[in-house]
C-alpha cells in the first residue's frame, strides 16, 4: 500500500506539480489491520481462551489499539477534507455534480467522526476494566499460577505473537507492559482509588455511547455494560463487600 501511494504521488506530481497524492491506500490498510487485531483479541475473550489473570494486559493492549483506530480515522477525515479542498480549487466553481459529491463526502466525514467517538468510548471501557483489575490485583483477589510453573513474559509473548510481524502499529512489548503496571501500582496505596478511577472511565464511556446514534455496533448492550460496571465500581470504591472473594 505504501508503494502504491508513493507511485501515485510521483504520477500525480508529474502531471500536476502543485498537487500531491494523499496516503489513502496506506490509511485504508492500517484501518483494516487494526480492525482485525481488535477482533482477534475480542474473539479470544468471547471464546474464553484467556484466564482471568491475563485480562489486564489484554485490555491494556486493546486500549492501545482503539487509540490507534481513532487516530487512523482522524487521519482519514483529514485526507478526505484535503482532497475535497483540492478538487474545489481545481474546478473553481461548484455545480450540481460537485455539490452532490460534497454532500457524499460530508456524509463520510460524519460517519468517521461518529466511529472515532465510538473508539474513544471503547478506550474508556478498556481503561475502566484495567483499573478495576489493578484494584483487584492490589487487594489480592486475582489468583496467579505458581511462579515455578508460570512465566508471565512467555504468556504475554505467546498471546500477542501474531502482531510481532507488523511494523505499524508498532507491537507492544512485555517490558512496556511491566513498566506501566509497576508505575501504576507504585503510586496507588489503596484499591478503592483504582475503583474510583475505573468508575470514572466507565461513566465517560457511557456518556460517549449515549451521544451516538448512527454507529452499527450494538450500543444498547455496551450501554448496559458500562452502566452496570459503573455502579459496581462505585460500590467497590465505597468498600461494599470488601471482604468477599
Regions found by a protein language model. Give the residues of each.
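Extended alpha-helical scaffold/coiled-coil
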Residues: 1-245
Amino acid at each position: 500500500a505504501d508503494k502504491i501511494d508513493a507511485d501515485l504521488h510521483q504520477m500525480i506530481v508529474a502531471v500536476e506539480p502543485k498537487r500531491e497524492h494523499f496516503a489513502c491506500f496506506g490509511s485504508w490498510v492500517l484501518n483494516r489491520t487494526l480492525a482485525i487485531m481488535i477482533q482477534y483479541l475480542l474473539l479470544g475473550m468471547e471464546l474464553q481462551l484467556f484466564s482471568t489473570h491475563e485480562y489486564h494486559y489484554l485490555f491494556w493492549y486493546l486500549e492501545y489499539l482503539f487509540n490507534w483506530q481513532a487516530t487512523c480515522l482522524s487521519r482519514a477525515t483529514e485526507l478526505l477534507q484535503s482532497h475535497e479542498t483540492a478538487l474545489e480549487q481545481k474546478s473553481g466553481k461548484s455545480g450540481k455534480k460537485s455539490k452532490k459529491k460534497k454532500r457524499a463526502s460530508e456524509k463520510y466525514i460524519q460517519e468517521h467522526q461518529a466511529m472515532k467517538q465510538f473508539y474513544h468510548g471503547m478506550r474508556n471501557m478498556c481503561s475502566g476494566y484495567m483499573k478495576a483489575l489493578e484494584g483487584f490485583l492490589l487487594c489480592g483477589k486475582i489468583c496467579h499460577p505458581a511462579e515455578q510453573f508460570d512465566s508471565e513474559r512467555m504468556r504475554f509473548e505467546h498471546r500477542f505473537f501474531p502482531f510481532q510481524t507488523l511494523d505499524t502499529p508498532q507491537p507492544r512489548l512485555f517490558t512496556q507492559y511491566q513498566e506501566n503496571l509497576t508505575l501504576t501500582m507504585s503510586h496507588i496505596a489503596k484499591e478503592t482509588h483504582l475503583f474510583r478511577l475505573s468508575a470514572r472511565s466507565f461513566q465517560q464511556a457511557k456518556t460517549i455511547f449515549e451521544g451516538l446514534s448512527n454507529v452499527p455496533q450494538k450500543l444498547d448492550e455496551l450501554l448496559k455494560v458500562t452502566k452496570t460496571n459503573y455502579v459496581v465500581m462505585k460500590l467497590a470504591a465505597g468498600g461494599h463487600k470488601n471482604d468477599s472473594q
